[in-house]
Each structure stands twice: as structure tokens, then as C-alpha cells.
Swiss-Prot record:
GO terms for molecular function: 2-(3-amino-3-carboxypropyl)histidine synthase activity; 4 iron, 4 sulfur cluster binding; metal ion binding. Binds 1 [4Fe-4S] cluster per subunit. The cluster facilitates the reduction of the catalytic iron-sulfur cluster in the DPH1 subunit. This is 2-(3-amino-3-carboxypropyl)histidine synthase subunit 2. Coiled coil: none annotated. Its cofactor is [4Fe-4S] cluster. The gene is Dph2. Gene3D superfamilies: Diphthamide synthesis DPH1/DPH2 domain 1, Diphthamide synthesis DPH1/DPH2 domain 3.
Length: 489
């Protein structure tokens, strides 16, 4: 049955996916999905049940890949699709429900450490790269052969960085090649323990060198990309890269380059705006945006502690993948904070936008921790794990008696003076023998009461004695989808 408020039950079965599936010719499956390496991974572990996780755009090949792997390995394959939050994260919960002994992740990945010790391997794909065109573009944007530059790429172009570096190394000596921070096979020792791991990549820095000294040349961005559809992986790099250092992107198909400095400036300016909105907020909604990334529970407890120390009220919301329609059900929230992987937190927002700003945990940290950033260090972080104890960027909250809590602060949005946290403005009981008791004109300031008083409609009015008495009449019968007095359609 169909009505104004509901769709027929058959609509869910007839609905087509919004992303067209990819269908690879059978003779190219082994090359595109690296089935030889995946087969070795499964056979070395002796797995009998393996889950294959595909993003929406690769689900068209999922059946053929699973059938090929079952035929070669003899193991039972389970296909995972339509993940609850983001396909870039490993769906360890889905793998555990299937009783899998290993997981193979296909497509773009954030490479965040999973919350489970399940053996995992990644197949990032191999996008074609015009090496000669990219090498000429690099030389055009970097005329100084002594300037330090690091080669970056989107995950699908990582295979081309080594060949590209071979074309450039005779001329450029201070060239650093990044590689994806893939998990090592179980039981294998680390071959490069000195590598710096950041942004889901490993940087083999020489002793005494720092990543902040390098410019960047990114292979993977398209010339037609705009700010509204900026790839979240590129956004993560632009936010975290050292301000003032050159950052160029190169289209792997055409070799056209683009200076990303202006986009990086706009991203940082928006981050400063969101930090101001978080400082003005009194009620914060913490969105659980991942359950499969390591330390997500510890991060959630850290964010609740942050908001409490700043005198804000927080609520934890588990709504799955956030959409404007879902978040519109919580008008009491001033801002939302999405606890997700770096790519999920920086994913492009829907065209309509959210009615309240959606922040990352790093922006909430900057808004609520008066000791942030640490002296001499102003990193633009993108992953919540970098805020937790054990990270070099972790900054503990100052003690209650610290003067940092009393620093005057003026909102750059409203122009009003922000009050200190409520616990800071309470009476000092250390020497209160001769302090007169206040008049208590305002007993308590509640964010919930302030929000209720600002609403146009505050509920049904009693209007006692003003409503005429009437005899009770029979109401409507049935359920909301089809009352008895409504004709069936």
C-alpha cells in the first residue's frame, strides 16, 4: 500500500543503486584485483572463510572475483557491501558476523588501524599514470633541483611513484617517495622502522630531516575537481601539510598541474570558522561515525571529557551515516562532532548541507582545550587518534587552577565576550567567612531552558478555564497509514 507518508514495500527491491557498478572483462580480473597476491594471502593463512569488502562502484565485479577466488583457494568467500559508515574503513564487524578468518579490502582505503586483530590485506587498485607527462609537469613546477620535495599520490596511483622517481632522480637528489602505510603480514618484521607514518602513508626520512621541510607533488587530482567535490584524501593532505610549503597536484591522465595553496588556505580558514562555532556552542552532539577503527571508544570518552571541562553539555548520537534529514531531528544541538576516520570526517557534505555545522574531533579539541596548540607546534591534525595519550600531539587539559581557563575570550562570530566555564565562576570557598551571600536572582543558567524559551512553539497550552466544555466524540480508528474512514488506494 502506498500513501503520502510511505512508499510501497516493493520499492526497496526495485530501487537502483546511485553509483553504477563496474564490470571488468574476465581476462583482466587477475590484473585489476591482484588475485595472485590475494590467493597467496589466503593460502598462507590457511583460511577457510574469507570476507571480500567492495565499495559501491566495484560491486559489479564482486561475484566474479569471489567465484574465481573460491575456485583457486577452496575457501568460502563472503561479499561485504553497503557498509554502515564508509567503505574506506575496514568492516571488521561484518567480517566477525560472517565468522571470517581474514578480510580482503578492495578499493580506496583510509588505512586507519582497525579495532580488531583480524588479518587484513588491501587491494588499492592500479590507475593508469602517464609517467612522461607527470615527469615534465614535475620539472616545470620545481625548477630548483636542490629543493626538497616529496612524491604523494592517491592510493590507486601509488604503484607509479617508484617509476616516476626513477625518471626524476638523476636531476633531483632531495626527492622523498611516500608509500601507503599498509599493515605488515602477520609475523613479518618491519623493514623500515625509522619511517615516519602520517596521513596513512610512510615517509622514509633521513636522520635529522623533518617532513615540514618538504614541498609536495601529488599525483591523482583531476583538473576539473572543485572545492565542493574535493577528494577527502587530498583534503587531509592539504590540511595537514605545513603552511607556506609548495603543494602541487598533477592529473595522472593529462599531466596538468594545479597549485593547491589557495585551496589549502580556504580549508584552514573554514577550520578556524568551525573552531569559533564550537567555542560558541553550549550543546554538542557527538556522532558515532565508526565502530571498526581502533581506539574509537577512548576517543569518545576523551571528547566527552573535553566538553565537560569547557562547560558544554554533550550527547552521544548513533545514527549511522549522518544525513541532513537525520540530524534535523536534533535541533537542540549547536554543533555536531563526527567521530570517524580522517576520510569519513572530511568527506564532501551533501548539496543541501547540514542545518548545524559538522566538525571533526580536532576542531573540538582546539575549541575546548585552552592549552592547544602546544608551544612551537601548530599541527593541523585530521585523525582523532593523534589527540589521545601516547601521540606526540597529545596536549593534556590544564589543571583547574590554571590561569588559562581565565583568559578573556571574545567570539569572532557574535562579538560577545565568552564566559568562563560554570565550574570556574563558582564561589571560592577557601576564604569565604566574610563574603556576603549573593541575592541569587538567577539560580541556574540551563542551555535546555534557554533553547526552550527561544522556540516559537513550546508545547500545548493548558488554557485552564478558557476552553468550553464539550461532549466527547468518537475519534478515528485504525493505524496512521490507513484509517477506517479513508478509502484504500
Amino acid at each position: 500500500m502506498e500513501s503520502t507518508f510511505s512508499s510501497p514495500a516493493e520499492a526497496a527491491l526495485q530501487r537502483e543503486a546511485g553509483v553504477p557498478g563496474q564490470f571488468t572483462p574476465p581476462e583482466d580480473l587477475d590484473r585489476v584485483y591482484e588475485l595472485e597476491r590475494v590467493t597467496k594471502f589466503v593460502c598462507d593463512l590457511g583460511c577457510q572463510r574469507v570476507t571480500l569488502q567492495f565499495p559501491d562502484q566495484l560491486l559489479g565485479d564482486a561475484g566474479a572475483v569471489a567465484a574465481r577466488l573460491e575456485e583457486v583457494t577452496g575457501a568460502k568467500m563472503f561479499i561485504l557491501g553497503d557498509t554502515a559508515y564508509g567503505s574506506c574503513c575496514v568492516d571488521v564487524l561484518g567480517a566477525e558476523q560472517a565468522g571470517a578468518q581474514a578480510l580482503v579490502h578492495f578499493g580506496p582505503a583510509c588505512l586507519s588501524p582497525p579495532a580488531s586483530q583480524l588479518p587484513i590485506t588491501f587491494v588499492l587498485g592500479q590507475r593508469p599514470v602517464a609517467l612522461e607527462l607527470c615527469a615534465k609537469a614535475f620539472e616545470a613546477q620545481n625548477p630548483d633541483p636542490t629543493a626538497p620535495v616529496v612524491l604523494l599520490s592517491e592510493p590507486a596511483c601509488a604503484h607509479a611513484l617508484e617509476p616516476l622517481a626513477m625518471l626524476l632522480l638523476p636531476k633531483y637528489q632531495d626527492l622523498l617517495i611516500s608509500r601507503p602505510a599498509l599493515p605488515l603480514p602477520v609475523g613479518s618484521p618491519s623493514s623500515q622502522p625509522e619511517s615516519l607514518e602520517r596521513f596513512g602513508r610512510c615517509f622514509p626520512l633521513n636522520p635529522g630531516r623533518r617532513l615540514e621541510e618538504y614541498g609536495a607533488f601529488y599525483v591523482g587530482a583531476s583538473q576539473a575537481s572543485s572545492d565542493s567535490s574535493l577528494d577527502p584524501d587530498l583534503s587531509r593532505l592539504l590540511l595537514g601539510w605545513t603552511p607556506g610549503r609548495p603543494f602541487f597536484s598533477c592529473c595522472p591522465d593529462t599531466g596538468q598541474t594545479q597549485d593547491q595553496g589557495a585551496k589549502a588556505g580556504r580549508l584552514r580558514a573554514r577550520r578556524l570558522y568551525l573552531i569559533e562555532r564550537a567555542r560558541d556552542a553550549r550543546v554538542v552532539g557527538l556522532l558515532a561515525g565508526t565502530l571498526g577503527v581502533a581506539r574509537h571508544r577512548e576517543a569518545l570518552a576523551h571528547l566527552r571529557k573535553l566538553t565537560e571541562a569547557a562547560g558544554k553539555r554533550s550527547y552521544v548520537l548513533a545514527v549511522g551515516k549522518p544525513t541532513p534529514a537525520k540530524l534535523a531531528n536534533f535541533p537542540e544541538m549547536d554543533v555536531f562532532v563526527l567521530l570517524a576516520c580522517p576520510l569519513g570526517a572530511l568527506a564532501p557534505q551533501p548539496s543541501g548541507g547540514f542545518f548545524r555545522p559538522v566538525l571533526t574531533p580536532c576542531e573540538l579539541e582546539a575549541a575546548c582545550n585552552p592549552a592547544w596548540p602546544p608551544p612551537g607546534l601548530a599541527p593541523h591534525l585530521t585523525h582523532y587518534a593523534e589527540l589521545l595519550p601516547g601521540s606526540p600531539f597529545h596536549v593534556p587539559l590544564p589543571p583547574p587552577e590554571s590561569e588559562l581557563w581565565d583568559t578573556p575570550d571574545v567570539s569572532l562570530i557574535s562579538g560577545e565576550l565568552r564566559p568562563p566555564p560554570p565550574w570556574k565562576s563558582s564561589d571560592d570557598t577557601r576564604c569565604s567567612a566574610l563574603i556576603p551571600r549573593p541575592q541569587l536572582e538567577l539560580a541556574e543558567s540551563s542551555p535546555a531552558a534557554s533553547f526552550l524559551s527561544s522556540r516559537n512553539w513550546q508545547g500545548l497550552e493548558p488554557r485552564l478555564g478558557q476552553t468550553p466544555v464539550k461532549e466527547a466524540v468518537r475519534g478515528r480508528r485504525g493505524i496512521a497509514i490507513a484509517y477506517e474512514d479513508e478509502g484504500s488506494s
